[in-house]
């Protein structure tokens, strides 16, 4: 018999979001008349922008003609026109088109990057953070076994991101030659790294031989012009950082699947070889390129009309976040000492429930309010006693959920 990959034995029991779905199903089964509203998983709910739909429709129709048909590209990095538009529109020329690698989404890029870097790399993650950073590292053999305390993995450096440090980590505990995972705007906290924060990060990475994997999937939600949307706004970042981006949340492509990562030409491994060359070999071997239909939609999303229409949807979600933040300021939450954190630049509201376990709060909100949330403990040890509320939802549902939450008793 073929042996199971030992790395998978080290995974913690259950991935966060399937566990949430399981508890929701069980509650629904025992309460069949309950109308459950989800403020949990970050899946978009609003329709694609009309301009994007028309572009994808036109492309699909062209595929039905001899003149318009095309198969996969010779280069798995994406259509040249889309790579150039990303470089021009998103990065204002800070990076070049050959440094853009179009993909089927940031999550997929994360998995391929983790495979490329392999088991012999040190890992540092924000705590709390998107679970894929840790779970993917475990699968790649870079995390070791679960710590004896049951909190985290032995070979991962957890960088606490708490209200006390403005949700940006102290880098002093990070070992040299580490992969440093940073997400801004952050999932789950919603915090955005400042220019000073990222300058410190870049300086640390360059000094200590680290590579930053910078997840900027929510950058389109930033409304404060003083906050950086890309790590490449910081001098020296091209020598130490890979940035991952996505059309999923800003353009509603969670089901369409389209994203990209930037691998600068200046970024090198210890032996002086270019990371971009290894990444090119990686994707040409293990990936055949993003869907041509999705790429047609991506081109439309980044022209003037597409940007205007997607901004309207982003604003809609940000307004939902404001409604959730308002609901968490009601008397019952104040009496319980609940503190919501949200700067208005992300589709999430992160709330502290002092003295309570986050899964207990999750269960209380589900049972009393019939609202699904996300327990902070699922994002890492420092997420305990926090709850993440997602603003991805229809307005009427968000408003109704807010009303129900005002009756929560803890």
Task: Give the predicted meaning of each segment.
Residues 273-290, 294, 301-326:
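Structural signature of PLP-dependent enzymes
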Residues 31, 140, 207-208, 369:
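Helix C-cap/helix->beta junction micro-motif
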Residues 2-105, 112, 301-307, 410:
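N-terminal small-domain helix-loop-helix segment of the aminotransferase-like
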Residues 233-277:
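Active-site PLP attachment segment
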Residues 94, 124, 360, 364-373, ...:
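PLP-dependent enzyme catalytic core of the Aspartate aminotransferase-like
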Residues 61-62, 66-205, 219-238, 242:
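Conserved core of the PLP fold type I
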Residues 295, 299, 314-325, 337-352, ...:
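Conserved glycine-rich beta-strand-loop-beta hairpin in the small C-terminal domain of fold type I
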